[in-house]
């Protein structure tokens, strides 16, 4: 299952389009999934679901691969300018702090992927596809 809304509408897609209150429903979904058949391959990204609380729950119930995506400050700035977003410096700093804290807490269960060039993104895309299609973590 891929979590989020991907319909080509707007600057932000995926879990950014979900309600801020989505976590309760997400955890209920995960609970039902782990009791049912074939409880694997749940893919999500973004600020709504990528929280320490959710990751702790998932690590307790599922074989898990946590991928933390990073970019250089220069690449990140160019990306924000290109899409013309209006996220405040305070918001961006808060997201960085959140990811840094998650990275520290889950250092033994996470991998860092640097996505500064399109080739980095393509490489990670290939890895994700192999992990999902070969049923390996």
Ranges and model annotations:
Residues 1-48, 53:
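Conserved nucleotide-sensing/catalytic segment adjacent to the nucleotide-binding pocket
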Residues 2, 64-68, 112-114:
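Conserved beta-strand scaffold positions in the cores of enzyme catalytic domains, especially
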Residues 4-7, 70, 116-118:
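Residues at the C-termini of beta-strands that transition into short coil/loop
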Residues 19-31, 51-54, 85-101, 125-130:
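Well-ordered, non-membrane alpha-helical segments in soluble/globular domains
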Residues 33, 37, 58, 105-106:
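Hydrophobic helix-cap positions at the C-terminus of alpha-helices
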Residues 45-46, 60-80:
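Conserved phosphate-donor/acceptor-positioning beta-strand/loop module used by diverse small-molecule
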Residues 55-65, 131-133:
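Short, surface-exposed basic-aromatic patches at helix termini and helix-loop junctions that form
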Residues 104-137:
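NTP-dependent small-molecule kinase module
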């Amino acid at each position: 299952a891929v979590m989020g809304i991907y319909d080509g509408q707007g600057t932000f897609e995926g879990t950014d389009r979900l309600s801020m209150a989505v976590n309760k429903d997400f955890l209920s979904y995960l609970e039902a999934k782990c009791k049912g058949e074939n409880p694997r391959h749940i893919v999500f990204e973004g600020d709504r679901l990528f929280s320490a609380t959710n990751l702790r729950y998932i690590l307790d119930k599922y074989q898990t691969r946590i991928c933390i995506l990073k970019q250089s400050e220069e690449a990140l700035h160019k990306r924000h300018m290109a899409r013309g977003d209006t996220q405040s410096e305070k918001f961006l700093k808060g997201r960085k702090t959140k990811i840094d804290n998650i990275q520290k807490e889950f250092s033994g269960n996470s991998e860092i992927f640097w996505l500064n060039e399109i080739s980095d993104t393509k490489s990670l895309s290939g890895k994700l596809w192999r992990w999902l299609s070969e049923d390996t973590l």
